[in-house]
Amino acid sequence: MSARPYVLAETAWPALSDAGVTVAVLPWGATEPHNFHLPHGTDTYQSDALAAEGARRAWERGAKAMVLPTVPFGCQTGQRDLSFAPGLLPSTQQAILRDLAHDLERRGVAHLVLFNGHGGNEFRAMLRELQPGLRLHLLLVN
């Protein structure tokens, strides 16, 4: 068994076949400069760590939560001229979110918590557009 059975990337398939996961947590960061003192992965590292801690606490209280692998690319159109600040368009983010939500819903997940770690990611309008077409409940943590 994984030391963190609530983190998908660290969990082997046999443990997942009967896990009964009802809550999926999707950390979403960005890869961009943070002045001279912080690494490009700051937004991703923070959202990943905070999502895992939240899932740990939920797991300890009996919730069947699972943290999905963190999406490391955000929307940072204002940093397109900076070296190695790869980003996604909002339409690409929405397509990723839509596809994952439908896939998770098909697998019986009841709630998808989007854990946003980057100020340039604007998910509220996307969630409002996607929610009516889903049985799965979308939640946003900014």
Q: Where in the sequence are the language-model features?
A:
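Short helix-capping segments at alpha-helix termini
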Residues: R57-A63, P132-H137
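Active-site and ligand/interface coordination hotspots across diverse enzymes
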Residues: M1-L38
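Short catalytic helix/loop segments, enriched in acidic residues and glycine
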Residues: D43-R56
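Active-site histidine-anchored catalytic micro-motif
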Residues: R4, T70-N142
